[in-house]
Amino acid sequence: MLVRNLCRSAWDVATFQLEAFFISLQAMSEQENKIIIITAPSGSGKTSITKHLLDNFPQLAFSISAATRKPRSYEQDGKDYYFLSEKDFHDKIRNNEFLEWEMVYDGKYYGTLKSEVRRIWDNQQVPVLDIDVKGAIHVQGQYPQSSLSIFIEPPSVDELKRRLLSRGTESGDSLQARVNKAAYELSFEHHFHHVIVNQDLNKAKQEAEEIVRKFLKQ
């Protein structure tokens, strides 16, 4: 009887440990598959809001995009972008290494590498993608159950134009191209889970923070 009880006790412990292991795996898988997508027309405040989220949620990690443009003086390869030659970028397209990619401005290519998202998941963090509108729609379609998408928009196209001018990096044709693209992208806002109108940056940051906090608790 004592032997039988000991065997039963050992079996119960083993069963409990096995159940706990599978529950842990399930929880890890659910967290691993989560992905946050922040998108907006250029000049809407997307970068500032993304930085705020990363500063306030340690479980988030910025997904570094790949790009074929030349780095600016303050940018570092592997930190701000993965700077690739156009040949390397196209090789990765052919090898199906991108989660999404697009030719954005002036023939320059940008994209999200699958390996980058996997790197973040392997660290048991949630990737935050700061990407173009078309790419955001594509990624959301690949993760319909486990993604959170936030579309940031300016109060108006005129305000967006004013913000772009204040940067001092756009003028003439390039400015008009960005404004035209932004007006087009605004028509896609209904594709995303949440829309934040960035009239006041601090309020927009708080709204994004509340949305992300709820998503991470699911």
Residue ranges of each PLM-predicted region?
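NTP-dependent small-molecule kinase module
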Residues: 29, 162-170, 184-218
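Hydrophobic anchor at the beta1->P-loop junction of P-loop NTPases
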Residues: 38
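Walker A/P-loop
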Residues: 47
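Conserved phosphate-donor/acceptor-positioning beta-strand/loop module used by diverse small-molecule
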Residues: 128-132, 143-165
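ATP-dependent small-molecule kinase phosphotransfer cores
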Residues: 67-127, 134-137
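P-loop (Walker A) phosphate-binding loop of NTP-binding proteins
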Residues: 41
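ATP-binding Walker
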Residues: 44
